[in-house]
């Protein structure tokens, strides 16, 4: 089994240092999204006392030329703390902090999608948009081969692995359980986990979260996942289709509702929202993975519990549709719906913002409106359309 060398270090030796008292000092780990739009980075500093609110954590900086975010001649970037969590690795009173990234001129970095998302969420605060995101991922050895799979072959066909139990059906549960507990300790709104259809593939769910909290909590949950995997010497990939062939891909199904959908008669509002989404399918495909639909073109094939990237569809309890209305929601007449199109490596800020823009702000077409100056600008420009994406 291919695991990292660092995972073989004696953790007992490390533990004796972790137990040392640290006085009044507090370690704060700043976490941010790098220039790929997928990776997370972190660095830690010492504060003189435990921060009680996010406002007590100072801004910081980092070398953006080493994170694909700046040139070496003008490399300093700003870290702006926005959400604070408990640190499950160094324990209380130490903290993890989710940060926005600003450039030298204090404008948002290109991959800082939180900045605009927060403004949009504040605009629709009265609608109380709730989200729950189902993060699928695949465990790999450091050689890039799925963890637990035969070195020179494949496991048996899909069927016994989903929510499976037993050493011959699930691989890496120690990672999953450790991540779950670490998220609970941190204050992440994690609400469940399960083994997925492909062996070595897992899912955890975060939510319900209102507004901007969805992106903050999912990104920090991803960071914690990568740190837990680091301790175990394995890798968690969010690739939407890590294995070609007759294997399921990995998505980030997004459950969504507004206050009007969650009360009696809400099904009508759900249906209205789905109709709006159907008219803007191409736009959503472009923002549902970091490569403008290229990644999802490998996953959304109409097979393996996915819809076709070329067509919009919706149905009750239909996991082969773009939008699924849960059976209970259809029966009770209110609740939420599930958008099954976002890829596992999507940016939750982009996904949640797009849902709000289309269903609440009634935006249409491929352009998103800049509500500050009234001018429209297109995030879809330069991105592959879903029809073009199929050729990549």
From Swiss-Prot:
Cofactor needs: Mg(2+); Mn(2+)
EC nos: 6.3.1.2
GO CC annotation: cytoplasm; cytosol; endoplasmic reticulum; mitochondrion
Function of the protein: Glutamine synthetase that catalyzes the ATP-dependent conversion of glutamate and ammonia to glutamine.
One example GO MF annotation: ATP binding
Disulfide bond sites: none
Record: residues binding Mn(2+) 2: 136, 196, 203
Top-level class of the enzyme under EC nomenclature: ligase
Keyword line: ATP-binding, Cytoplasm, Endoplasmic reticulum, Ligase, Magnesium, Manganese, Metal-binding, Microsome, Mitochondrion, Nucleotide-binding
Localization: Cytoplasm, Cytosol; Microsome; Mitochondrion
Protein name listed in UniProt: Glutamine synthetase
Pfam families, alphabetized: Gln-synt_C, Gln-synt_N
PANTHER family linked to this entry: GLUTAMINE SYNTHETASE
């Amino acid at each position: 089994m291919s695991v990292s060398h660092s995972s073989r270090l004696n953790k007992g030796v490390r533990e004796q240092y972790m137990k040392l008292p640290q006085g009044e000092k507090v370690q704060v780990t700043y976490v941010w999204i790098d220039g790929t739009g997928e990776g997370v980075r972190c660095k830690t500093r010492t504060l003189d006392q435990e921060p009680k609110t996010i406002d007590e954590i100072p801004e910081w900086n980092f070398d953006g030329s080493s994170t694909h975010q700046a040139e070496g001649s003008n490399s300093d970037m700003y870290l702006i703390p926005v959400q604070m969590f408990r640190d499950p690795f160094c324990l209380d009173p130490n903290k993890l902090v989710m940060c926005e990234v600003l450039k030298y001129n204090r404008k948002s970095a290109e991959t800082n999608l939180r900045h605009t998302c927060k403004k949009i969420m504040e605009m629709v605060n009265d609608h109380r948009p709730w989200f729950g995101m189902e993060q699928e991922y695949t465990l790999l050895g450091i050689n890039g081969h799925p963890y637990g799979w035969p070195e020179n072959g494949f496991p048996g066909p899909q069927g016994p692995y989903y929510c499976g139990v037993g050493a011959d059906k699930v691989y890496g549960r120690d990672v999953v359980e450790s991540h779950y507990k670490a998220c609970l300790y941190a204050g992440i709104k994690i609400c469940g986990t399960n083994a997925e259809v492909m062996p070595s593939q897992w899912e955890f769910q975060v939510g319900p979260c209102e507004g901007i909290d969805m992106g903050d909590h999912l990104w920090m949950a991803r960071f914690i996942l990568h740190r837990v995997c680091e301790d175990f010497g394995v890798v968690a990939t969010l690739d939407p289709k890590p294995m070609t062939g007759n294997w399921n891909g990995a998505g980030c199904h997004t459950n969504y509702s507004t206050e009007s959908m969650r009360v009696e008669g809400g099904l009508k509002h759900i249906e209205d929202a789905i109709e709006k989404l159907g008219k803007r399918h191409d736009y959503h495909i472009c923002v549902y993975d970091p490569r403008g639909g290229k990644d999802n073109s490998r996953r959304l094939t109409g097979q393996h519990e996915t819809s076709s990237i070329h067509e919009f569809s919706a149905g009750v309890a239909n996991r082969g549709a773009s939008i699924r209305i849960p059976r209970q929601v259809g029966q009770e007449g209110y609740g939420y719906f599930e958008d099954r199109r976002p890829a596992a490596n999507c940016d939750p800020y982009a996904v949640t913002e797009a849902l709000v823009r289309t269903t609440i702000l009634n935006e249409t077409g491929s352009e998103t409106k800049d509500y500050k100056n009234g001018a429209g600008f297109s995030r879809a420009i330069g991105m592959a359309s879903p029809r073009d994406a199929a050729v990549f």
